[in-house]
Amino acid sequence: MWRLKIADGGSDPYIYSTNNFVGRQTWEFDPQAGSPQERAEVEEARRNFYDNRYQVKPSGDLLWRMQFLKEKNFKQTIPPVKVEDGEEITYEKSTAALRRAVHFYSALQASDGHWPAENAGPLFFLPPLVMCMYITGHLNTVFPAEHQKEILRYIYYHQNEDGGWGLHIEGHSTMFCTALSYICMRILGEGPDGGQDNACARARKWILDHGGVTHMPSWGKTWLSILGIFEWIGSNPMPPEFWILPSFLPMHPAKMWCYCRMVYMPMSYLYGKRFVGPITPLILQLREELYTQPYHQVNWKKVRHLCAKEDIYYPHPLIQDLLWDSLYIFTEPLLTRWPFNKLVREKALQVTMKHIHYEDENSRYITIGCVEKVLCMLACWVEDPNGDYFKKHIARIPDYIWVAEDGIKMQSFGSQEWDTGFAIQALLASNLTDEIGPTLARGHDFIKKSQVKDNPSGDFESMHRHISKGSWTFSDQDHGWQVSDCTAEGLKCCLLFSIMPPEIVGEKMEPEQLYDSVNVLLSLQSKNGGLAAWEPAGAQEWLELLNSTEFFADIVIEHEYIECTASAMQTLVLFKKLYPGHRKKEIENFIKNAAQFLQVIQMPDGSWYGNWGVCFTYGTWFALGGLAAVGKTYNNCLAVRRAVDFLLRAQRDNGGWGESYLSCPKKEYVPLEGNKSNLVHTAWAMMGLIHAGQAERDPTPLHRAAKLIINSQLEDGDFPQQEITGVFMKNCMLHYAAYKNIYPLWALAEYRKHVPLPLGKNLNQVVNCIGQSLYKKYK
């Protein structure tokens, strides 16, 4: 059976940590583990997922949950509650539902204080890792038989009915992910017509029916060129000379969004080397299987700009194609010939590799994310197949692997800190501290130990890095990359804990560490009042015209985000109350400008576009929280009134809210089909309305929403898995498996705290008894 291990560094001599691996989560397969009953439960979970895979596409993340609940011998002892039609929700019933959710989720806390969870969903994460291991000869070492079995399961279970795979698990089929998945199946031993339910034959038919892999988007062409199934001359140039451009140029790497920079850094190295993996018999077979014409007859120069229509979200503007053409026709022929190949290209490759090593070292070889991880790892192998750099990369592969009932997938890079910050706030909102003191103390300890203690090493500004000391990352301290909203939420948790009894929640964080966090937040605000996520924004907007990906938008430069801005506003308002003397004027200006930013970018319908969650419901919850923190109310702020109107219009007949992921790419509100509701969306909308004072005006919409959440709760206190709720770069969805627990729990907590409710029969009896006793005593 598969087992999740927590904060375990293992015995690999090539792995190291800044905080003894706090937050690390790795999976291992133990063939001896598990009773026959436990194994049967796992198989049943797999079968249930497969049978319902077209109805609910994200996993319920059940394997580790089964493990943890078994290890802790958890039994739900609080009876379930239901609210009948026409029945009023009482304080007693809301408390029972809340306590059930709190006790269940507390039992899922890991030993180091964080809450594990899947953070995956894109279907282009895993295949490149398999390809990299195949190229380097480490496939069977890194992925033994059980791993390969589960990788194949994941591919089979997420194949669309038309035979293809989407950009993400809920998406329509694309050439990019269909070709990658097909190649992955073939590498893992399936024949051209093999796989569960004829997976390979159906996939190949889809590929050929849509023009073959000459219609791959640019990232796909890059990976196929690396693998030897495509020719580099069929790709647009990615010159490593980019890394030696003068800093005054507008397209200098320092001005790029960090993820864009980190992807094209190793890509440009591999392109500059024109690296191609070993041409094995399998590669020769794939050349025959994936094209609509013989491989040797492909006109590579003419396929550079081809892309399947299913893959295009951001069509290349003409000016971009002209730029690639000029580089292709004039620049590359010069840079690949003497003397420029020695004078310029070799130097550019050396500088690029220097940046790769710097980023690897400063992230303990986790790198900034999974796409970059595989490319940097391969670049290190190309530089030296037997070198320590590559071995250190191999040691960190387990940090990206996640196992659930739908198989093995590759994580974005883990959401440990992000999920835990919200989980703690939800639990604190429940006002059940007396029942969950040890849970809160462990969570507090994890948050404190996960704060980044140092800036990147050396002259980090020359390596295009920003300060990170005092920040929190999305995942764990070893990752090292500061994120503004993760920092805001981590800091908020520490501030909330600082006003609680230390004998219950542990000692509060030192003020200097809090000040470091504030410094990071202040450094990331733009002139327009908005907050960037990773590094200061400010590059010229026209650079987005150079976005060479076809399936993402807004990836070239850093931008300001509603969620980051609102998170920081709420946190700095609280910080200002507790530490009124620290950078008072700067914080006041930050808050004032941030509030102005939120009001300026509100959509015409009263909503806010969510950049990291689906979509307008998510953004509106954050924005209303930020505005409420600075004293904006329904009565004194037009933006709040418009937002409330938007949310009330979107409420469904059953009392919930349900927004399709299509809202994100379309940038307009799209409800779920069939009048469906989603509990996570319902929770976000509820909390947004509570921020806006809905309880005082008309609590009826809140009662209707709370009824849906209470009646949807499962027997053990869990909530059902529904549609995917996370997103990045407008067009790709991300499955946050923890959200189904955190947000319904949190919404119930806020509902119980802010909405006046009748006590209920049993509580009324208790109150009457107490009243009678006091009356007799003092009469």
Swiss-Prot record:
CDD domains attached to this UniProt entry: SQCY_1
Active site per database record: 485
Gene Ontology CC entries for this record: lipid droplet
EC class of the enzyme, as a word: isomerase
Gene3D superfamilies: 1.50.10.20
Keyword Cell inner membrane: no
Protein name as it appears in the record: Beta-amyrin synthase
Gene source species: Betula platyphylla (Asian white birch)
Organism lineage string: Eukaryota, Viridiplantae, Streptophyta, Embryophyta, Tracheophyta
